[in-house]
Regions:
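Conserved AMP-binding/adenylation subdomain of ANL enzymes
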Residues: 223-240, 247-290, 305
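Gly/Ser/Thr-rich phosphate-binding loop
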Residues: 262, 289-293, 303-362, 374, ...
Length: 559
């Protein structure tokens, strides 16, 4: 038996164990062991294997104008091999860095597989990036090759560097057309084995306080690690999976590449320039979507449509990233008969904590540790594991496969994140008697008011229960008596007007649902500053709060 065959069998056995116990959390958690092959290339040792003679759709894309692209597993395997051969002819070598900045188009998936086959290191990039961000990525990422949409090529005019340039969907002077790849040979022969520990991806995280960190993943930490994501979503062979996420971010690789194809499911994409809930539901119905993942913002827009128009609702629905309004959860439950299940992970990891199928869902909880992850809460003072509330961390004594190698080129940050034998997430959580973990907030976002610890996440969750609130962010506001008090920046839902009447109602709501020491003391209406990936820039809000604002409402103004 060759090393490649052995690696495939080991991966399949682990995958099949999770599929067999898809709704039996206790058995899955106790019995799962990570496959740890010495050599493994997911594109060659898994995708190409399941693609042989497989005419089922691997990818189904529907554009806004109704045009469709359907690529079978067998076709995707062949196309990616052609692309790999063409890139190799153009000088792409193992360990080279390749920046890929494409939209939700077939070439994105072809390139991802081709890069894996060549053992190059992929730097995913969103088309939203501008020249300054691209200069940083090319320079710090030591990029040797760039593949972008033709319309984005001008962004690189002032991005220095010696890198090959390839455009998709058009010809640009000085760039080679991607489409040349389809004339390359369909058979691909790798130049040697792929060490499982070889680097595969470098993610530039969107920092809210500093330059992005470079998160490094290997040929197993993401492809194999996302068996956990497959388990959380509840994917199984033959499913049609829709995940609403933008290319370039980790969640896209989680749920539009590794998790669904680990399960041998179809990836379904609906491209649009402006979100239309009714149209999305119609396309989901037509495509037969069985599993659905969306961020809370999409869920909140989705319920504005008639959910019952979906004749066959998805079997599994999940969300992650921020709290969902109880109203959203209840409307989906009434219309589709399913609970939206939450999960927790990071760019640095796969899904660590989740409400997997078959578990009782506790409102507000992220769920329990996923198979293969030993999650501990570190005491905020002593750093010892076993706290009822503390920093969410992963025990590295039996290191989970789905954890990054580290922050590339930054040994100090890596050592800090991995200190004491734990991977420290920087997030605070609490654990109940049943092992369910509830998110409290970022360690650096939690603050004290009148000597009480305040979790912005908890206050934001409470505010989102009110119909007027579309989004909320809570930060500490300076106060002479209490040192700090909670202040909320609020984006109002459609139909609500900013002003004293709305402010008064929200203060009253805060007093009703929160303990006295947690209640809201100040608020301000307006947009929330965000990073390009959509994370709230709390440091900017804290700075604005410290500077003071005439647009601020205070609780005492309404007594």
């Amino acid at each position: 038996m060759s090393a490649r065959t052995s690696a495939t069998d080991e991966f399949r056995a682990a995958r099949d164990f999770l599929l067999a116990h898809r709704e039996d959390y206790a058995t899955a958690y106790e019995g799962f062991t990570w496959p740890r092959p010495e050599y493994f290339n997911w594109a060659l040792d898994w995708f190409d294997v399941i693609a042989r003679g497989n005419d089922r759709a691997a990818l189904h894309i529907v554009e806004e104008d109704g045009t469709e692209t359907v690529v079978s597993f067998a076709e995707m395997s062949e196309r990616s091999s052609r692309v790999a051969n063409r890139l190799r002819d153009r000088g792409v070598r193992a360990d080279d860095r390749i920046l890929v900045m494409l939209g939700n188009q077939a070439e994105l998936w072809e390139t991802a597989l081709a890069a894996m086959k060549l053992r190059t290191v992929v730097i995913p990039a969103t088309p939203l990036l501008g020249p300054a961000d691209l200069r940083d990525r090319v320079e710090r990422g030591r990029v040797r090759h760039v593949i972008v949409r033709a319309e984005d090529a001008p962004k690189f005019a002032d991005v220095p560097g010696r890198y090959t340039r390839t455009t998709v969907g058009g010809t640009v002077d000085g760039w080679r057309p991607y489409e040349e790849a389809y004339a390359a040979p369909a058979r691909f022969e790798p130049n040697g084995p792929t060490n499982a520990s070889d680097p595969l991806m470098l993610y530039f995280t969107s920092g809210t306080t500093a330059r992005p960190k470079l998160v490094e993943h290997t040929h197993v930490s993401y492809p194999v690690g996302h068996l956990a994501t497959m388990y959380w979503i509840g994917l199984k062979p033959g499913d049609v999976h829709l995940n609403i996420s933008s290319p370039g971010w980790a969640k896209h690789a989680w749920s539009n590449l590794f998790a669904p194809w680990n399960a041998e499911a179809t990836v379904f994409i609906h491209n649009y320039t402006r979100f239309d809930a009714g149209r999305l539901l119609s396309e989901m119905d037509r495509a037969g979507v069985t599993t659905f993942c969306a961020p809370p913002t999409v869920w909140r827009m989705l319920i504005q449509a008639d959910l019952t128009q979906l004749r066959t609702p998805p079997r599994e629905v999940v969300a992650a990233g921020e709290p969902l309004n109880p109203e959203v959860i209840e409307q989906v439950r009434r219309a589709w008969g399913v609970d939206i299940r939450d999960g927790f992970g990071q760019t640095e990891t796969a899904v660590q904590v989740s409400n997997s199928p078959g578990q009782d869902v506790k409102t507000g909880s992220m769920g329990r540790p996923g198979p293969g992850f030993e999650v501990v809460l570190l005491d905020p003072v002593s750093g010892a594991p076993g706290a009822d509330e503390g920093e969410i961390a992963l025990d590295l004594s039996n290191r989970p496969v789905g954890v990054m190698t580290g922050y590339h080129g930054d040994p100090d940050r890596t050592a800090e994140a991995m200190a004491g034998g734990f991977y420290r997430t920087g997030d605070i959580g609490s654990r109940d008697e049943d092992g369910y973990i509830t998110y409290v907030g970022r360690a650096d976002d939690v603050f004290k008011a009148s000597d009480y610890k305040i979790s912005p996440f908890e206050l934001e969750s409470a505010l989102l229960e009110h119909d007027a609130v579309a989004e909320a962010a809570v930060v500490p506001a300076p106060d002479e008596l209490r040192l700090a008090v909670p202040k909320a920046y609020i984006v109002l839902a459609a139909g609500w007007e900013p002003g004293p009447d709305t402010a008064k109602e929200l203060f009253e709501h805060s007093r009703t649902v929160l303990a006295p020491y947690k209640r809201l003391r100040r608020l301000e209406f307006g947009d929330l500053p965000k990073t390009v990936s959509g994370k709230i820039r709390r440091i900017q809000l804290r700075e604005a709060t410290a500077a003071g604002s005439d647009a601020e409402y205070r609780e005492e103004d309404f007594r």
